[in-house]
Structure formats: structure tokens, C-alpha cells
């Protein structure tokens, strides 16, 4: 009887642990897909954005994706004060700045590679900035699924 209870507990705990890791993955994928939608919406307003060039990471090294993503989040995308789209742009940029859910890979990584600072990235106009951001998010999704 005791052995059966122990076996059932092991099976139950294995199922719960497996399920929680899938939930984390799902949250991250959902968030990244939301980010792609937000970037696509911002592209509709690219002519209403301040034309100032912004640091936009490109060709990001493996394991530096989250660092590069945080560089994108630190940038201040601003409306050019032309038209009534300022409020929409502000809402979308606030949504871009929400943190990504944590991942097990990020927690396990003890030795993190040296990633370039945000200032070291080449500056790009808003349209290219948004394209690079979308490309990075797609890369992160692909790596997460593989």
C-alpha cells in the first residue's frame, strides 16, 4: 500500500512539474505574439512618429536576444505631434515596455555572455527600428520553439 501511494505521488508531481513548464512557455509565446501585433500596429503609424534615429539592434548574437530586446524597450518612441494619433502611439509604446515572462533557460544560465551595450547599436529611423524589433521577436520565438 505504501509503495502505491509513493508511486502515485511521484506520478502526480511529475505531471504538475511538466504542466507548469508548459504554462511558462505558453505565456512567453503569447506575450511575444502580442508584441508582434503591437509592432505591426505601430508600423501603421510610422509616419506619425518622430523621425529621430533610434538605437536598433541588428544581427544579435545568440544568448543576447533578451538584452537586445531590453534595448528596444528602453528607446523612447515618440509621436511627432501631427494628427490625433498621439494617444494610440503612447498606448502601444507602453505595451511594448511590459516585461517578458521569465524562462527556465534564463534562470539556469550562470555564465552570461558579454552582450553589447544599448549605445553600441547602430541608429535607425523609426520604420527600420520597428522592422528590426519584429525580426528580433520572431527570432526569439523560433529559438524558443526549437
Swiss-Prot record:
UniProt record similarity statement: Belongs to the IL-15/IL-21 family.
Subcellular location: Secreted
Signal peptide per UniProt: 1-17
Keyword Disulfide bond (UniProt): yes
Alphabetized UniProt keyword annotations: Cytokine, Disulfide bond, Secreted, Signal
Stated role: Cytokine with immunoregulatory activity. May promote the transition between innate and adaptive immunity. Induces the production of IgG(1) and IgG(3) in B-cells. Implicated in the generation and maintenance of T follicular helper (Tfh) cells and the formation of germinal-centers. Together with IL6, control the early generation of Tfh cells and are critical for an effective antibody response to acute viral infection. May play a role in proliferation and maturation of natural killer (NK) cells in synergy with IL15.
Major site of localization recorded for this protein: secreted
GO molecular function: cytokine activity; interleukin-2 receptor binding
UniProt cross-references to SUPFAM superfamilies, sorted A to Z: 4-helical cytokines
Record's protein name: Interleukin-21
Disulfide bonds: 64-115, 71-118
BP terms from Gene Ontology: cell maturation; cellular response to virus; germinal center B cell differentiation; natural killer cell differentiation; natural killer cell mediated cytotoxicity; positive regulation of B cell proliferation; positive regulation of cytokine production; positive regulation of immunoglobulin production
GO CC term (a single one): extracellular space
Residue ranges, annotated region (Disordered): 100-120
Gene: IL21
Amino acid at each position: 500500500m505504501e509503495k502505491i501511494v509513493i508511486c502515485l505521488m511521484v506520478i502526480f508531481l511529475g505531471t504538475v512539474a511538466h504542466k507548469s513548464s508548459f504554462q511558462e512557455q505558453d505565456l512567453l509565446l503569447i506575450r511575444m505574439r502580442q508584441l508582434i501585433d503591437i509592432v505591426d500596429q505601430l508600423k501603421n503609424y510610422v509616419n506619425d512618429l518622430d523621425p529621430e534615429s533610434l538605437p536598433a539592434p541588428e544581427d544579435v548574437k545568440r544568448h543576447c536576444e533578451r538584452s537586445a530586446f531590453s534595448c528596444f524597450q528602453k528607446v523612447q518612441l515618440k509621436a511627432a505631434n501631427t494628427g490625433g494619433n498621439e494617444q494610440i502611439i503612447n498606448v502601444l509604446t507602453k505595451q511594448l515596455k511590459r516585461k517578458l515572462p521569465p524562462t527556465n533557460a534564463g534562470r539556469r544560465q550562470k555564465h552570461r555572455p558579454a552582450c553589447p551595450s544599448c549605445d553600441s547599436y547602430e541608429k535607425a529611423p523609426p520604420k527600420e527600428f520597428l522592422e528590426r524589433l519584429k525580426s528580433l521577436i520572431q527570432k526569439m520565438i523560433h529559438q524558443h520553439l526549437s
